[in-house]
A protein has these predicted regions:
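Sec-dependent bacterial lipoprotein signal peptides
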Residues: 1-16
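Function-determining sites in protein domains
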Residues: 17-235
């Protein structure tokens, strides 16, 4: 039965790999989120000679709003393609489907082209935030708070970094406001605010009845060896 186990494992890996439109479907979004947030597809396809790509994820409390910005370099001098995706809250799968059936789509997607000057300004801001530096080993990124997670393959080299609310640099990233201004989804960003962990835990417990599932949909990523890991999503 080894062949069957191998087939099942391959199918599971394929289901968890980021796919076009995956964020718009609640089931695929949940299955693929770890790989999408961590830029696994960018890393897997990273090679010299391929167009440079960037992905910036803004987690502004997982069950309130999540924004994903995918940038792909066009031929020299032509700028880049920007795909902006906003998930208005990331409720449980059944809730998301019911919202969509009721005419309340949970996801907005917009595609635009960045002229070379705008792309250059954005990349300077990303570099200015310290993207190229090694990420903090063991950094915890909790879903019920605010953070930015960025991954990129530039000139055949892949890299990842992250910034959390509360970190000094988080207040002056620069690239965040540029992305919000370039975003054509029409959805206002969920701005950072103070989060009380104790109150958050209490609210989650009340929503789930205080039972085993009292953490509700909360999870965390941990930065390790230049990648993100999470027992809740598998690695």
């Amino acid at each position: 039965l080894r062949w069957l186990s191998a087939v099942i494992a391959s199918l599971l890996l394929a289901a968890c790999a980021p796919t076009p439109g995956g964020l718009s479907d609640p089931i695929r979004r949940k299955a693929q989120w770890h790989a999408t947030a961590g830029g696994d597809d960018l890393r897997a396809g990273c090679a010299a000679g391929r167009p440079s790509r960037w992905r910036l994820v803004y987690n502004s409390v997982w069950d309130e709003q999540v924004r994903v910005y995918d940038i792909e370099r066009l031929p020299a001098g032509e700028g880049a393609r920007l795909v902006s995706t906003v998930v208005q809250g990331a409720p449980r799968v059944l809730q998301a489907y019911l919202m969509q059936l009721g005419g309340q789509p949970t996801t907005r997607v917009a595609e635009s082209r960045l002229p070379e000057p705008q792309l250059s300004a954005l990349l300077r801001a990303i570099d200015g935030a310290g993207f190229a530096r090694p990420p903090e080993e063991g950094m915890r990124l909790v879903s019920w708070d605010f953070y930015w997670l960025a991954s990129a393959c530039v000139d055949g080299t892949w890299h990842l970094n992250a910034w959390r609310r509360g970190d000094p640099v988080f207040q002056r990233l620069g690239f965040d406001e540029l992305l919000f201004a370039l975003d054509q989804t029409g959805v206002e960003p969920n701005r950072p605010r103070a989060i009380d962990p104790a109150r958050r835990a209490l609210e989650a417990g009340e929503q789930a009845g205080g039972g085993r599932g009292s953490r509700d949909e909360s999870f965390e990523f941990v930065v390790r060896d230049g990648r993100i890991w999470s027992p809740g999503f598998g690695n």
